[in-house]
Structures are given as C-alpha cells and as structure tokens.
C-alpha cells in the first residue's frame, strides 16, 4: 500500500503543479476572481495532500489495515474534493455547470477528515 500512496503522492504533486500553472496563466483571463479562488483552493488541497501522502508513504512502513484506510481515505478525499472543484469551476466558466459535482466536493472533504481522524487515532 505504501507504493500506491507514493504513486498517488507523485501524481497529485505533478498534476497540482500543472493545474496551478494552468490556472495562473490560462484560466486567470477566463475566470472571475471567485472562480479563480475556488480553483486555487483545489490546487492547494491537492498539493497539501500530495505532501502528506509522500511523508506517510515513507513513515507508515507497516502494512496494517489502519494504514491502508488512512491512505485510501486521503486518496479518495483528494480526488473527490479537488477534482470536483476543478470540474465545477471549468464547467461554470463555460456556462455548462455540471451540477452533480457540487455535492461531491463536501463528500471529498469528509473523506479527508476521515483520513486525518484515522491518522490521529493511530497516535492515541
């Protein structure tokens, strides 16, 4: 599972850099200030969790069910949270808002909270 966490850490890190540059250089002319701020929030959370997965991938070396749940919750949470924001912002900018993505963002946030909560639990 550590290899998967490290793989996703690298993927999230690389795509966050790409999407951050995309937002800063291309989307800034097409998005409102509010939309750009939302897009940047997605990028920030993605890079934060890339770093967390990278650190945990090297630190949590035991293959326990709890570590697996932590990794999965953080990976699923990052995908649902950040990528739903990207979809909402880009579709909204094209006047074709994809409404079903709206409820996905907080579900992603819940997965992130679960991952952090499980990590906290391992230290208790």
Please describe what each predicted stretch is.
Residues 1-124:
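Polytopic transmembrane helical bundles with strong interfacial aromatic enrichment
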């Amino acid at each position: 599972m550590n290899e998967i966490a490290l793989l996703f850490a690298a993927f999230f890190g690389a795509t966050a850099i790409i999407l951050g540059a995309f937002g800063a250089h291309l989307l800034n002319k097409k998005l409102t200030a509010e939309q750009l701020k939302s897009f940047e929030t997605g990028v920030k959370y993605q890079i934060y969790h890339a770093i967390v997965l990278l650190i945990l991938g090297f630190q949590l070396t035991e293959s326990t069910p709890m570590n697996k749940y932590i990794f999965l919750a953080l990976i699923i949470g990052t995908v649902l949270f950040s990528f739903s924001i990207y979809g909402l912002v880009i579709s909204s900018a094209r006047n074709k808002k994809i409404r079903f993505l709206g409820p996905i963002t907080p579900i992603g946030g819940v997965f992130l909270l679960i991952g952090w909560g499980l990590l906290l639990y391992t230290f208790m």
